[in-house]
Amino acid sequence: MDGDRTPEEQIEIAESDQGPQLDDNVELANVFSYSLDQRIMEGCVISAILEPRGLETIVAVSVTNKIIIKDKETSLNITETIRCIAAAPFGDGYDCIIIGTDSSVICYDVHNNLTVFRNDVPDGVSCFVYGKLGELDEAIYCGGNCCIWGFDKTGANTYWTVTGDQVTTMCLSDYDNDGETELVIGSPDFEIRVFKNDLMRTELMETDEITCLAHVANGCFAYSLNNGTIGTYVLKERQWRIKSKSNVSKIFNFEEEGLMVVVWKQGKVDLRFAHNGEVLSRDSVSSHVASASVSKKGDESFITVVCLDGKVKGFKIQRAQNGSIDKTQQLIREFGQKKHNLMMELSNYEQEEQLADVEKDRDFRIPVDTEVAVVFVVNTELQLLSLRVEASHNIPIRGVLIFAEGLFEGESYIWIPPNEYQSRSVIDIPLVIDKDSTNDLHTKVFLGQVDSNKLMVMENTRILPKFCRFTLLREEYSKFFYMPTAYIQFDINSRAAKLSEWVQESFTIDASLVEMFDEPEGEFKFMGLRPKHEKSLMFKISHSEKTCKIYHDKIETMGAIVQSYASFYQIQNMESVAHFPDVFKEADEILEEIDPMTEVRDRLTAELQERQAAVKEIIIRAEDSIAIDNIPDARKFYIRLKANDAAARQAAQLRWNNQERCVKSLRRLNKIIENCSRLRVGEPGRQIVVSCRSAIADDNKQIITKILQYGASV
């Protein structure tokens, strides 16, 4: 993609439309450097205007849990452990510092030296983003443990929603180009979630933990993963992806629309095009990076990189002084490489012509018309899906290299035949699928005779169906079918006249059996393959009544099937009736526990406060006894202090255990509601979430199970 890519980076694959035509004759120039004289906490660096009519300055958190402000001799001491910081324009023409700790959110006004507000946040805050979300007013949004809070400049709670996992990074971006920004969040469960106001709109599955998100262009956001991958999305389509051995510290857009800055933890700073990832310029710092930010001084913007050792280096974009010369040299290098490749190819042809027939026979030549077939096969007895590779003319397969996103560890798999399989021309490679997602399998097959020192490489690409973990059962294998107890029922849409088209694309099924799904009536049993070999699936279709009933015990898989069906036939809205006895029973149990757990939490909180007050009182009395030289009473007070301290610790532990149980229950309840909403499509699915939240807020919990089963129209 870019001519000067370093060896550790590997470009993956990304066809994209031509992006904005920007001047690429630019470079990063170092303009300033200084030191904060403190070691800096990773990820805790911002740029903010802290005084009226002031300039932007760097604010960072030291490893000693102090907030350092450049050019100020004093630092801010926070008693709680700081996790993240941000800046928000809550002052009159200046910014306030937003501090996220392990138990609260603090808004601090440096200009007036006061705390604007402090709000308790259970389980702490891990990331911030400030801005306007949808129709809501501007606020600071705080990502925590499975929850997101929003606070305005007075500290009032203006937003709250639940997520499926911990929130590690967030950004605001106009995801669907409707003129309103959406909240994009990343989690350790490999998912990027997009929220429209307080309702989840889209889920994007990645291959590792999401570490950074940033809006970089209109309708486009960038992401980075824990394995060193960076890329961009426009809607649900990934535009490009690059993988590096280093990890990303920060991504942000810079000045012009379509440019993005990527700062790597090991010190590299890249200026890239957002639409294709091409590098315009690259520079570096000498030590590991804590974080980076964009700051303005007058009309100029600067990239400020802060290292872990406190050293700060600033860059700006300027027109390259030797850009035309560099381009000419790059073209010369490219043409020189092409010339070298052509000369090597010509040399091979010349050597070929000089070989005698006897030498060619000894060279174990492969026939010109050799072909390699790559297909999916199912071993019903072993309940296993395999990738079969077969070479024509009985040519031995000497090795297979498979690339597949998220399927193998490291995203690649190498098969080398053992000694007894050296001469085989047909091999089966087992595939164990953990997730329901469409995947491209890129294979490179190495062919050659056993004694040959030359191998022929043939490439092939196969699409792995989304629900390849299920295969249609024939009558003779009905013993492998387990009748599920859960099901959903919905009306067949007029657009879905031919279910066979969707089934053929989404499941592992023999092409000769696909047409059965277009018959007026039918029951079709699917067997689950490993590792889900104990989960069966059945379709009961009646085209005359225009109904479809799907039996399966896994609600997550059922939701994925419904969404895939609706997406294939472009169905905007769809109702369904769901029957999941175990799931609904679990939801009822959680709802019954909420009120008692809340009461216990309040009681434990009050008890803990009493214990803490008693400890403080005893400490004061003990110190007073020492001050008047009453050592016997002081000894008694310290003995009492030890007992009360142990009791306070026990009360705190009980409160923490109750809080953890409450959070887990609420997280599970939210997941159940989210899964049930995915059993519907469009507005009916969104109304499930809205109705359940309203029922909980109104203390009308008894109707929640009915909403989950029959929809929000009950």
From Swiss-Prot:
It is found in: Cell projection, Cilium; Cytoplasm, Cytoskeleton, Cilium basal body; Cytoplasm, Cytoskeleton, Cilium axoneme. It comes from the Eukaryota. Residues 332-361, 597-627 form a coiled coil. The keyword Transport applies. Expressed in ciliated cells including amphid and both inner and outer labial neurons of the head and in both phasmid neurons PHA and PHB in the tail at larval stages L1 and L2. GO terms for cellular component: BBSome; ciliary basal body; cilium; cytoplasm; membrane; motile cilium; neuron projection. Keywords: Cell projection, Cilium, Cilium biogenesis/degradation, Coiled coil, Cytoplasm, Cytoskeleton, Protein transport, Transport. Pfam families: BBS2_GAE (PF14782), BBS2_hp (PF23353), BBS2_Mid (PF14783), BBS2_N (PF14781), BBS2_pf (PF23350). InterPro entries: Bardet-Biedl_syndrome_2_prot (IPR016616), BBS2_GAE_dom (IPR029333), BBS2_hp_dom (IPR055380), BBS2_Mid (IPR029429), BBS2_N (IPR029430), BBS2_pf_dom (IPR055379), WD40/YVTN_repeat-like_dom_sf (IPR015943), WD40_repeat_dom_sf (IPR036322). Transmembrane segments: none annotated. Disruption phenotype: Mutants have normal body morphology, but with reduced body length and width, delayed larval development and decreased roaming movements. Defective cilia structure and function. Disrupted assembly of the BBSome complex at the base of the cilia. Its main location: other. GO terms for biological process: cilium assembly; non-motile cilium assembly; protein transport. Gene3D superfamilies: YVTN repeat-like/Quinoprotein amine dehydrogenase (2.130.10.10). Part of BBSome complex, that contains at least bbs-1, bbs-2, bbs-4, bbs-5, osm-12, bbs-8/ttc-8 and bbs-9. Component of the BBSome complex. The BBSome complex is thought to function as a coat complex required for sorting of specific membrane proteins to the primary cilia. The BBSome complex is required for ciliogenesis but is dispensable for centriolar satellite function. Required for proper BBSome complex assembly and its ciliary localization. Required for cilia biogenesis and both the assembly and movement of intraflagellar transport proteins along the ciliary axoneme. This is BBSome complex member bbs-2. It comes from Caenorhabditis elegans. The lineage of its organism: Eukaryota, Metazoa, Ecdysozoa, Nematoda, Chromadorea.
